[in-house]
Amino acid sequence: MSRQYYLLNEPFCLRGYEMLPYGLLHRPDNSIGFVDKDTFWALSLCDGKTDCSLPIFPEKVRSILPELVKKGIARVCEYGAALTADQQYRKYENRYIRTAHWSITGKCNYRCRHCYMSAPEAKLGELSHETIMDLIRQIDECGITQVSLTGGEPLVRSDFEDIVRELSSRKIRITQIYSNGFLVNEKLLDMLEGYGQKPEFNMSYDGDEGMHDWLRGIDRAGEIVLKAFDLCAQRGFPTGSELCLHQRNKHLLRQSINTLGAHGVSSCKVNPVSETELWLRTTGEHASIEIEELFEIYLDYVPHFFEDGMPLSLMLGGFFWGGKGRRDYRVPFEKYPADADCSRMTLCGHARNTLYLSPEGRMLPCLSLSSFDEIQKDFPLVTEIGLKTGLTDSSYMKLIDTRLEELWEVNKTCGSCQYRTRCGGSCRASALCTPGNDLMGCDRAACLYFGGHYDQKLREKLSGIAEIS
């Protein structure tokens, strides 16, 4: 039998983590897939030097090689072809995290009424340039290959280009930049493209008729962000948005969604305004929307979403998700089928894959927790323990790896609920907003959805209009 040599194609790199040793990374999008032991063995043989025809390798493993070629992952080569240094196997001695959602500053040039971190007052400040650079090194050395940058307003950092340069030099992809749009201009987009980065710009828009200006505390804020959306569309940068719903803008939901669609925005998440300490101090409870009213607003609106041609991908909290141009929908509240065995699933799939780093360097499951001062104290500062330890043995790691069976054990209401499987624990940040601020409490929004039979109400409302997927 003639000798056979294979080489991994250059976009692909071999990676491994604690408890997930068999990973295949794809450049430059930095997506990673985990495979079984035999497939990874076959991938490891694709080094340009190993004769894969040798009978010492099991037939089961050798039979995988032609499939890798068909899929464009590897190719047949001559002896001596070599992997690049980046392609060679790297094993990270910590648990896997896909993305770091990073507040690189707590400072902001706007005065939003509901800010989680009171950014107008810069309550959490920002880390020094040297510390930020060291954290990028740690992110790289822990195998985190994607970051999204937020704040405060991330673009107010004077060393923002240095951050982009350092991330890019380490092949870390910037997936999103969360901005208010004020500093989004041609020069910024040129700089990002120069480093090979083309992130989505996620910019909040809280309604037509001056509502965005009112919530953000800046004159012409609405005009500014719509121009930023237009510029990104012209330059080929994807855009997304978030809309905070309250008593003053609830009647503008349909109109505002259509405005975003007209400006090329590809997706929007709608949620009620968070009753942060700043919101309650500056605006008050009377301007908030209770969950019961919120669901009725959503229920009234969803037929119009389809009537208006599904202008963007839309998420109405956990109540509804519809894709741009699609005639079907799904309900994020519905995590698992009623008969599924999900007891060993983590409390939150998003939190298990995405680390949130606060402006002071605190490791949190999500940005929403940054408004709960007492809860934050339970989680580590990466500047004190280091990222590797934080992703190995910490209160942060313990929480994001907590399983549903543990929630059901400590929360008897959830544990005995007939909807517990479909709900799958719902949202822990939402649970914190209920009286008692209990991280392992009930998510009142999910309780209302299931207990109030909104699944049936939604089906009836969309009968003949759209099908649930």
Feature names for model-found ranges:
Residues M117, H129-T150, R157-S288:
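Radical SAM/AdoMet-radical enzyme domain recognition
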Residues K107-M117, P365-S368, K412-S430:
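Local cysteine-cluster metal-coordination motifs and their immediate loop/turn environment
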Residues M1-P120:
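N-terminal pre-core extensions flanking Radical SAM catalytic domains
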Residues L135-G151, G441-S469:
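Short Fe-S-cluster ligation motifs
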Residues R27, L357-S358:
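Short, acidic, Ser/Thr-enriched surface-loop or helix-capping motifs
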Residues C348-R352:
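Short, small/polar residue-rich loop motifs at catalytic or cofactor-binding pockets
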Residues E292-K335, R362-M363, L367-Q418, L462:
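C-terminal accessory region of radical SAM enzymes
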Residues K91-G152, T354:
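Conserved small-residue-rich
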